[in-house]
């Protein structure tokens, strides 16, 4: 049962957007998916409450913000959305569960500095050897200098860059209905599906 953790200590980098869409991808493949939310804001849980009955099922993994335990039997794939400022024993508990960690990163100097420290902590963690870590650029406008700086930063990390997701209203509109880019006709989100190809391939390894 793969456990995918979406983590970055910086708030507002797109963790919930990434977590819900990763869960949506697994659900689109017919897996028994649980989406856990260790963030006190419970954004992912709220999103699940908006999900229409006709959509592919994604179950709620009841994660107490102060106690993270393994999900129930019968689950084939788990996605865990984590809060900003994740550290200490909660950080350790999350990484004990993780098979894969996706770190979302925005093209901002503040995000880059905060994420660099976090990636160093991941590399030094005692469970680092069993985790795969990948980077996803979030809300990236490829035409900007900031995007170029982000690419320069991630290319020097020695970690796989899974993809760059553009800044689009598609994610906002779909999230408001409890949906993901994997729940609608591909023709409606063609550019976004192209950007997800590398992420999906990495998730399936």
Predicted regions and their residues:
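Conserved C-terminal guanine-recognition region of P-loop GTPase G domains, centered on the G4
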Residues: 113-130, 138
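Hydrophobic anchor at the start of a short beta-strand
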Residues: 32-33, 78, 132-133, 161-162
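Conserved Switch II/interswitch segment of TRAFAC-class P-loop GTPases
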Residues: 98-117, 141-143
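NTP-binding/hydrolysis catalytic cores, primarily Walker-type P-loop NTPases
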Residues: 181-205
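Beta-strand-loop-alpha "switch" segments that mediate conformational coupling across diverse proteins
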Residues: 141, 151-182
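P-loop/Walker-type NTP enzyme "switch/lid" segment
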Residues: 2-13, 20-96, 175-183
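Motif I (Walker A/P-loop) of helicase-class P-loop NTPases
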Residues: 16-20, 115-116
